[in-house]
């Protein structure tokens, strides 16, 4: 049936197309619609479901009374059938009734007669007839198309015509009727009348009955037909359109053609309006004189046709085609109105020549303004007949746009483009098109276009004047400030050298918000590769000679340097352009380094510098533009990048594609910038001051900071936003931005993409942190409030982008030289960076204790320079460890942003021992993690100090609570630890409950909430610490926690890094070995998993942070979590454990970092400590690490995931803080539950947060998590970001440097924790990371907290609560 129907329809259409509406005889379908039993038309066709043969229902039923086989299948042995096998075919029934005129009515009449005869008149359904007869009268109305009415004057609107016609009336007769009404000769080829229904042009062979069937006319109201009169320049246009419509009739019988016509008229409604102003379309139509009618409709058509005709040449103009620019869209408006008819007539002729394309696409291609003119009243005027909008019409649209160019007054910017186009069009339209297209794309240098550009060099290359600029104007518009002089020079160069095409590399706006124009000359002469030459003011002739290599670019740079006398802006622009072109080459994979060898040695160095400097220069240009633009050139001249040269190839390859360009900036770019900045510093004291603030050691960031701190750019409130903006700008400004890779990456906050560069950046961050402390001292002396705020804000921002240098820049000169040179040095610096935190002062108070504790821990003394307030650096790491997870949601990217924010937030928490509760409240989200980290670091440093556990307890519970799900696993009983792990994975509430069960002895209080847990915290601290140690041992990932083995409290904190599975095993073992205050005992219990971890923990309670920082730096440099990364050998084990936590943090910070760290942690065991945990739970750890790496890779934004997990982690940290208070007696229980919870903290689930603390802590954490409801990642990120920014602003002034150290540490933590966290769920890893990083940070905090009474543990807990709320 369906096949038959389709066939019929197709045949009918074909017949209609071929001839008149009645061209198809019903007899052609007889075989399809007649019954084989009665040989008549099938009435109520019924199909046999077996063979699909169709018969009249009455016929087949009668047949079944005699036989049980299908009449057509019986001979072939068909199946037996019965009434159940019969299916009514309503579709075929409808087709038959529609095909056979009068059949339906005859059957209805017969049925009625039959019923009357047999008295079967049951509720006769007097439904309206479903089918029409050719003689049935249909009411209809003819109305002038509303889209054309605007052209008519108030008294010229034609009246609506109402008719009643037979259903068989063809549309052709309606058209003839209209022609007679308006005295239009039907054979007049210049005038056409179109009849539309529902904005679809009807084919002339359609009948009213066809319209009723096709549009489901319901007989409720007259058919509302619309008509319009179209005027053509010549008959050819009409014929072409008619032919097109006929061609399209096969698909949609004339709908497409008339749509095209309507589209034309509609498109040119404005033109018609101008004509109609002279006379209404009807008056024209009414006038027998076709010209009068034609003026209105023809003008419309002519406009469209003219547009079409001219567009052919313009079609070559790629820009006009691509852009819906008003310049192109309104090209013909003014002239059309002034000379509507003439132009329109011309256009119609051209259009007639190209009627098909023009008809279809005019509506679409013409800008809305033009469409309004044509169909002001009805956008729907674009008839539903989309057929006319054919792909073929698109070119005509383009042509129309170009044609319009000549007519319309173009903006100045558009003018040059049009002029170029006109010149090229006059020469060769297609060449111009191709050339323009190539120019726009920037693929090939076009000699002729270059000539044209030479003729109009300035206008063409003015930001908006050139066709190329139109394409790149959006990107280049901001760079216009840089490139006015460059534009002219490059223009002249391009004109002189046709082979070279000057390309404005697209760059994001600079910090100042202006886009720099980089003129890259593409050398077509290059043998196999296109080389981009940065055009500066240097002679392009020389460059042209050297166009094959970048040597010309180098010479240009040298010339620019020599030409320092030229405007500083011009120099900066040139440098920026060169850097960008080099970056683009790097991004594109073009052999930028190869050209370097061709250049002279100095040139090579300069090229390397330039390559490294592209970022540096971009930053410096921005910075120095603010400071002194000429400084950049001296830097470039004198600048030698001894350390950076090794970086450029790898960095550029890795850097250019990755969004981690900040890392290259920091590492490769940073050193060159340092040198450059140092060079300027000597000549300029002012620059030295600003650069000193920015820390030359971290030039890339410092350069950005130089801009910002020097100008006071980073207001505390602004810091997060501007940081992001600057990083984004940098990336955008780099060629990668052209590729849009960098642009995309910033969305992630660079965290994920920083895999290698990020680590390097983090190294820089560690350096920056160290330097930031010195810088903070520096800045305090110079501009404490302002520079601190600037340094602080930049640091978080830099970190978020993997550029910690900004924040720590100020101190980098003092501390960073060694830091940048050696990671170990950096670690002590970050240690000293406590002032970096906004809460550095409280840290300073605690630091004395912390310093003492760190020395107590040989690792801490050796690992990190306690010379600087050690507490702050641990706080920094703690803030970073804790903070980054909290901050991660906002900085989906690398943990640097998170670290920065965490630093910002933790900045407050760092003083947490005393003032932290308030700061935490202020910065709840990020502050959570810092307190936990601070407390953890302090506890690690002072394994035996309850104050450390208090400090830990102060902050970590909040973070732990964030990932409360893991909290239950902290429960002390080893029996419940497995359940705790499971629960921690399940949900914070469950975790909390299990935590209660596990920590029944001393942590039952924590069941209810953190508050309940607080009273037990002191007593539980010992147990928690022991448990932590056990957990760390059991987890093997709880390096930081395990580090506190000497004290159970420290162990608890370290446990956060332990994997849940490990934690359970370790927890079981740990309970066996009493807290004993010995990590070794716990290790003995968990010797397989935790022996190394415990040793590591013992070594690195305080050193864990130091080692973490060292490792972070080493990992950044070596991209490995190996113990050697830790600064101190003794710290290596404990540090690795702490590093595991840090690595977890790193995991949350960046997917790339996670992958590398996890792989390294799995392979190398995260150094001695990580190896212990990895080897302790080796196979699980490694296996989990690899899956996590895979998952991290699969996760687009691991940082975001980390943040999603972060809230729970923060809450977990809070709960952990309390567990720190758990007494040693409870150690076995705590360790039992902690291992499980630690594992979750690492990655399994919220239980990881519990792992940092004792089970009581987990209980507290779970209550917080339950109370708090894990928020969505977006919510947490938003809250954390807002609070972090607010707090960062406040805290930045106090201790921005600490943030740097935290940032430095946190990457390590992330890395170390990565190995641990990798083992559990990848999604959990981010959570674990936050908790672990919080714990790691805590050692520093603990150092500061150590002096703080246990009562301080409660305030930190409160702070943790505030952070939890903020995360929620």
Swiss-Prot record:
PROSITE patterns: ZF_RING_1, ZF_RING_2
GO molecular function: DNA binding; promoter-specific chromatin binding; zinc ion binding
Keywords, ordered alphabetically: Developmental protein, DNA-binding, Metal-binding, Nucleus, Zinc, Zinc-finger
UniProt biased composition (Polar residues): 449-461, 936-953, 962-977
Stated name of the protein: Protein suppressor 2 of zeste
Cited function: Regulates expression of the homeotic selector genes by influencing higher-order chromatin structure through interaction with other proteins.
Organism of this sequence: Drosophila melanogaster (Fruit fly)
Predominant subcellular localization, coarse grouping: nucleus
Compartments reported by the entry: Nucleus
Biased composition regions of type Low complexity, renumbered to the chain: 462-495, 599-628, 672-689, 1078-1099, 1119-1138, 1161-1183, 1231-1263
Chain ranges of zinc fingers (RING-type): 35-74
Pfam short name (any one): zf-C3HC4
Gene Ontology cellular-component terms listed: nucleus; PRC1 complex
């Amino acid at each position: 049936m369906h096949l038959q129907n389709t066939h019929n329809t197709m045949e009918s259409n074909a017949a209609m197309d071929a001839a008149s509406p009645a061209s198809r005889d019903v007899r052609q379908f007889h075989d399809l619609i007649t019954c084989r039993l009665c040989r008549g038309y099938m009435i109520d066709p019924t199909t046999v479901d077996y063979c699909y043969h169709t018969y009249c229902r009455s016929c087949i039923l009668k047949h079944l009374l005699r036989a049980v086989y299908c009449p057509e299948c019986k001979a072939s042995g068909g199946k037996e059938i019965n009434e159940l096998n019969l299916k009514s075919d309503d579709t075929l029934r409808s087709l038959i009734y529609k095909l056979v005129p009068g059949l339906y009515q005859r059957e209805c009449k017969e049925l009625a007669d039959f019923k009357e005869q047999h008295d079967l008149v049951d509720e006769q359904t007097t439904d309206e007839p479903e089918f029409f007869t050719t003689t049935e009268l249909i009411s209809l109305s003819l109305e002038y198309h509303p889209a054309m009415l605007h052209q008519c004057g108030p008294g010229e609107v034609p009246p609506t015509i109402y008719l009643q016609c037979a259903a068989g009336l063809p549309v052709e007769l309606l058209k003839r009727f209209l022609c007679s009404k308006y005295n239009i000769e039907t054979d007049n080829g210049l005038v056409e009348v179109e009849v539309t229904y529902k904005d679809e042009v009807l084919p002339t062979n359609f009948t009213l009955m066809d319209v009723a069937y096709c549009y489901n006319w319901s007989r409720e109201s007259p058919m509302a037909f619309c008509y319009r009169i179209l005027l053509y320049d010549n008959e050819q246009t009409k014929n072409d359109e008619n032919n097109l419509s006929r061609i399209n009739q096969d698909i949609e019988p004339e709908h497409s053609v008339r749509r095209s016509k309507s589209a034309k008229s509609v498109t040119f409604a404005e033109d018609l309006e101008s004509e109609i102003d002279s006379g209404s379309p009807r008056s024209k139509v009414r006038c027998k004189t076709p010209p009068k009618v034609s003026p209105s409709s023809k003008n419309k058509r002519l406009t469209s046709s003219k547009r079409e005709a001219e567009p052919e040449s313009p079609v070559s103009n790629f820009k006009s085609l691509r852009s819906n620019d008003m310049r192109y869209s309104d090209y013909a408006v003014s002239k059309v109105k002034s000379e509507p008819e003439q132009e329109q007539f011309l256009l119609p002729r051209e259009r007639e020549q190209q009627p098909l394309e023009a008809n279809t696409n005019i509506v679409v291609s013409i800008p809305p303004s033009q469409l309004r003119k044509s169909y002001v009243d009805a956008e729907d005027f674009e008839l539903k007949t989309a057929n006319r909008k054919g792909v073929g019409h698109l070119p005509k649209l383009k042509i129309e746009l170009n044609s319009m160019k000549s007519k319309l007054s173009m903006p100045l910017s558009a003018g040059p483009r049009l002029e170029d186009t006109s010149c090229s069009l006059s020469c060769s339209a297609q060449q111009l098109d191709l050339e323009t297209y190539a120019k726009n794309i920037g693929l090939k240098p076009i000699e002729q276009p270059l000539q044209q550009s030479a003729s109009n060099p300035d206008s063409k290359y003015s930001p908006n004047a050139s066709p190329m600029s139109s394409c790149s104007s959006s990107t280049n518009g901001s760079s216009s400030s840089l490139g006015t002089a460059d534009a002219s020079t490059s223009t002249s160069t391009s004109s002189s050298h046709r082979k070279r095409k000057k390309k404005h590399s697209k760059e994001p706006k600079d910090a100042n918000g202006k886009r720099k124009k980089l003129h890259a000359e593409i050398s077509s002469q290059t043998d196999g590769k296109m080389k981009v030459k940065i055009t500066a003011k240097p002679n392009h002739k020389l460059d042209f000679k050297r166009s094959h290599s970048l040597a010309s670019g180098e010479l240009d740079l040298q010339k620019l340097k020599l030409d320092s006398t030229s405007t500083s802006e011009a120099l900066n622009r040139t440098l920026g352009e060169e850097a960008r072109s080099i970056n683009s080459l790097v991004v594109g994979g073009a052999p930028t380094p190869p050209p370097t060898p061709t250049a002279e040695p100095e040139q090579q160095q300069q090229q390397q510098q330039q390559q490294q400097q592209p970022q540096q220069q971009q930053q410096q240009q921005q910075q120095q533009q603010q400071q002194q633009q000429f400084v950049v050139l001296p830097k470039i001249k004198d600048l030698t990048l001894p350390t950076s040269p090794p970086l450029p190839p790898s960095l550029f390859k890795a850097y250019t594609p990755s969004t981690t360009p900040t890392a290259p900036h920091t590492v490769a770019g940073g050193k060159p910038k340092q040198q450059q900045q140092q060079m300027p510093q000597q000549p300029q004291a002012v620059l030295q001051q600003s650069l000193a603030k920015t820390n030359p050691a971290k030039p890339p960031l410092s350069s950005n900071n130089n801009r910002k701190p020097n100008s006071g750019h980073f207001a505390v409130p602004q810091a997060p936003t501007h940081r992001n903006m600057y990083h984004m700008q940098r990336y955008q400004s780099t060629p990668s931005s052209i590729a849009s890779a960098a642009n995309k990456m910033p969305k992630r906050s660079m965290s994920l993409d920083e895999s290698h560069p990020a680590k390097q950046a983090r190294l820089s961050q560690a350096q920056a942190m160290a330097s930031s402390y010195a810088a903070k001292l520096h800045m305090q002396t110079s501009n404490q409030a302002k520079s601190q705020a600037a340094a602080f804000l930049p640091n978080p921002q830099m970190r978020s982008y993997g550029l910690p240098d900004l924040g720590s820049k100020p101190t980098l000169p003092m501390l960073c030289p060694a830091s940048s040179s050696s990671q170990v040095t950096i670690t002590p610096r970050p240690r000293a960076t406590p002032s970096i935190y906004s809460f550095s002062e409280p840290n300073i108070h605690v630091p004395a204790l912390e310093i003492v504790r760190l020395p107590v821990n040989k690792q801490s003394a050796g690992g990190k320079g306690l010379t600087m307030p050690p507490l702050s650096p641990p706080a920094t790491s703690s803030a970073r460890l804790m903070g980054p997870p909290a901050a991660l949601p906002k900085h989906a990217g690398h943990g640097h942003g998170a670290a920065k924010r965490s630093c910002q937030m933790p900045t407050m928490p760092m003083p947490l021992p005393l003032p932290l509760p308030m700061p935490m409240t202020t910065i709840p989200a990020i502050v959570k993690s810092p307190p936990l980290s601070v407390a953890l670091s302090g506890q690690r440093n002072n394994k035996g100090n309850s104050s450390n556990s208090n400090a830990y307890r102060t902050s970590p519970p909040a973070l732990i609570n964030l990932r409360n799900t893991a909290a239950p696993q902290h429960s002390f009983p080893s029996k419940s630890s497995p359940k705790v792990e499971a629960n921690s994975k399940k949900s914070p509430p469950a975790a909390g409950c299990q935590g209660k069960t596990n920590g029944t002895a001393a942590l039952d209080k924590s069941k209810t909430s953190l508050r309940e847990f607080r009273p037990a915290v002191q007593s539980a601290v010992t147990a928690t610490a022991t448990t932590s140690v056990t957990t760390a041992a059991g987890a093997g990932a709880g390096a930081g926690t395990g580090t506190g083995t000497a004290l159970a409290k420290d162990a608890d904190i370290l446990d956060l890094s332990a994997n849940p599975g490990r934690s359970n095993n370790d927890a079981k073992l740990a309970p066996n070995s009493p807290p004993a205050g010995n990590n070794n005992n716990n290790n003995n219990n968990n010797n397989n998993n935790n022996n190394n971890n415990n040793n590591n923990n013992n070594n690195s309670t305080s050193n864990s942070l130091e080692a973490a920082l060292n490792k972070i730096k080493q990992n950044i440099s070596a991209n490995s979590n190996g113990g050697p990364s830790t600064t101190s050998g003794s710290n290596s084990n404990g540090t690795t454990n702490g590093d595991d936590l840090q690595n977890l943090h790193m995991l949350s910070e960046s997917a790339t970092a996670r992958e590398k760290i996890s792989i390294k942690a799995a392979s190398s065991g995260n150094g001695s400590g990580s190896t212990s945990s990895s080897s302790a739970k080796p196979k699980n750890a490694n296996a989990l690490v690899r899956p996590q790496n895979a998952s991290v890779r699969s996760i687009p934004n691991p940082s975001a995931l980390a943040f999603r997990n972060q809230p729970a982690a923060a809450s977990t940290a809070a709960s952990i803080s309390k567990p720190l208070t758990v007494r040693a007696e409870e150690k076995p229980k705590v360790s039992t539950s902690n291992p499980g919870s630690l594992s979750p903290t690492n990655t399994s689930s919220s239980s990881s947060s519990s792992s940092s603390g004792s089970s009581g802590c987990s209980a507290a954490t779970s209550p917080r998590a339950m109370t708090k409801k894990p928020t969505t990642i977006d919510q947490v990120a938003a809250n954390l970001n807002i609070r972090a920014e607010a707090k960062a602003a406040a805290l930045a002034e106090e201790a921005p440097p600490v943030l740097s150290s935290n940032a430095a540490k946190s990457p390590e933590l992330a890395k170390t924790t990565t190995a641990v966290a990798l083992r559990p769920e990848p999604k959990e890893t981010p959570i674990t990371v936050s908790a672990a990083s919080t714990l790691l940070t805590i050692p520093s905090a603990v150092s500061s907290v150590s002096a703080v009474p246990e009562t301080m543990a409660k305030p930190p807990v409160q702070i943790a609560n505030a952070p939890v709320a903020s995360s929620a």
